[in-house]
Amino acid sequence: MGDASLSVLASSQVVAEGGNNFLVPNGTFFFVLAIFLIVLAVIGTFVVPPVMKVLRERDAMVAKTAADNRKAAEQFEAAQADYEEAMTEARVQASSLRDNARAEGRKVVEDARAKAEQEVLSTLQLAARQLKRERDAVELDLRANVASMSATLASRILGVDVAPAAATTSATKTSGR
């Protein structure tokens, strides 16, 4: 308890001497305040303007980048639309070309088929005429030789020699029914 009474006694002496009042500021406070204001002025004058300049440049750069991105996106949209339009036009054109090629191919096939049918028809007509000529020639030959052939056949069957004139008369009698 002796220490507490000594400190109360020391404080009462300081108050009695009129020295250290905590409500009245001392010189240290003013000195620290002056240093703070000087440092604040130096920082505000030499440090803040370059930092603000860099920040403004970055803001401008970010704004320019955003504008460039928007412009690039718009250009991309326009290019995409042009591409889609060109592709649609190309598809329509390709479809038209394909349809034309199919129609032309069908026409070529039909023309070839018609030509082949015409050739077949002409070949058949030629063959028919040739067969008719050969048939007529064979018929004439057979008519010319029928008498001698029938006489020869009758001779072989009957075993008797038959004359061609008799064979002709007997052949006309049997066929004349």
From Swiss-Prot:
Subunit and interaction comment: F-type ATPases have 2 components, F(1) - the catalytic core - and F(0) - the membrane proton channel. F(1) has five subunits: alpha(3), beta(3), gamma(1), delta(1), epsilon(1). F(0) has three main subunits: a(1), b(2) and c(10-14). The alpha and beta chains form an alternating ring which encloses part of the gamma chain. F(1) is attached to F(0) by a central stalk formed by the gamma and epsilon chains, while a peripheral stalk is formed by the delta and b chains.
Native source organism of the sequence: Mycolicibacterium paratuberculosis (strain ATCC BAA-968 / K-10) (Mycobacterium paratuberculosis)
Membrane topology, from the record: Single-pass membrane protein
Recorded family membership: Belongs to the ATPase B chain family.
GO molecular function: proton-transporting ATP synthase activity, rotational mechanism; proton-transporting ATPase activity, rotational mechanism
Protein name (Swiss-Prot/TrEMBL): ATP synthase subunit b
Cell compartments where the protein resides: Cell membrane
Pfam families, A to Z: ATP-synt_B
Sorted UniProt keywords: ATP synthesis, Cell membrane, CF(0), Hydrogen ion transport, Ion transport, Membrane, Transmembrane, Transmembrane helix, Transport
Membrane spanning stretches: 29-49
One annotated Gene Ontology cellular component of this protein: plasma membrane
Purpose: F(1)F(0) ATP synthase produces ATP from ADP in the presence of a proton or sodium gradient. F-type ATPases consist of two structural domains, F(1) containing the extramembraneous catalytic core and F(0) containing the membrane proton channel, linked together by a central stalk and a peripheral stalk. During catalysis, ATP synthesis in the catalytic domain of F(1) is coupled via a rotary mechanism of the central stalk subunits to proton translocation.
Main location: membrane
InterPro entries referenced in this protein's UniProt entry, alphabetically: ATP_synth_B-like_membr_sf, ATP_synth_b/b'su_bac/chlpt, ATP_synthase_B_chain
